[in-house]
Amino acid sequence: MAGVLKKTTGLVGLAVCSTPHERLSILYTKILDVLAEIPKNAAYRKYTEQITNEKLAMVKAEPDVKKLEDQLQGGQLEEVILQAEHELSLARKMRDWKPWEPLVEEPPADQWKWPI
């Protein structure tokens, strides 16, 4: 890529990324590294890993920024980068929260019954 393709994203507070492919590759790889620490049978890992691998393959296969934006369907690449940063943050939290483990205590019998 020969320099920045655009001067602004047109979105307040969202700066243009000069190396979006590199940034996305790094973020998606970090997400996959965190997911590897979560049990394979956890639903969050299974589905997030599948989506992240698909997106990483698109980033590696498509050098054209505009075509990649169209394939990822997440807006401008700067927006996709922001989404990937949020997913990485969530993956780290999920790893720490361990939602796949059993509850500490049993929930009340009518917890989800409505109306009571």
UniProtKB/Swiss-Prot annotation:
Sequence positions bearing Phosphoserine: S89
Principal subcellular localization: mitochondrion
Subcellular location: Mitochondrion inner membrane
Keyword Signal tagged: no
Modification N-acetylalanine occurs at: A2
Record keyword GTP-binding present: no
Pfam families associated with the record: ETC_C1_NDUFA5 (PF04716)
Superkingdom of origin organism: Eukaryota
This protein's UniProt keywords: Acetylation, Electron transport, Membrane, Mitochondrion, Mitochondrion inner membrane, Phosphoprotein, Respiratory chain, Transport
Any one Gene Ontology BP term: respiratory electron transport chain
N6-acetyllysine modifications at: K30, K46, K60, K98
Protein name as annotated: NADH dehydrogenase [ubiquinone] 1 alpha subcomplex subunit 5
Family from the record: Belongs to the complex I NDUFA5 subunit family.
Topology relative to the membrane: Peripheral membrane protein
Positions of modified residues (N6-succinyllysine): K98
Quaternary structure and interacting proteins, as annotated: Complex I is composed of 45 different subunits.
Role this protein plays: Accessory subunit of the mitochondrial membrane respiratory chain NADH dehydrogenase (Complex I), that is believed not to be involved in catalysis. Complex I functions in the transfer of electrons from NADH to the respiratory chain. The immediate electron acceptor for the enzyme is believed to be ubiquinone.
Protein's organism: Macaca fascicularis
A GO cellular-component term linked to this record: respiratory chain complex I
